[in-house]
């Protein structure tokens, strides 16, 4: 690729980044139930539920793996159905019931499956 073409591509990428950073993004208010507890949060229209759970709500038990819904690392239950959180928008959780690995724990401690994950360093599972 010629230097002029490379410079043009770099400028185009810089311009895209600049536009993304200056365009205000409307936030969506969402009310949902997570592991039996009511939650309310703000998210943008493109934010994944995985990102909301981890970055906004601090529920880091749900892991990011492939970001394509194939690996299962981000699996949650949404209204009782197993789904990859990386493929669900945060706004889609409005009025729905979410279950995460944090909700599996028992009052007496870790669920036996959680304990095995811990014992065998199955951190992405």
Could you tell me what each predicted segment is?
Residues 15-125:
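Signature of N-terminal electron-transfer/Fe-S-associated modules in redox systems
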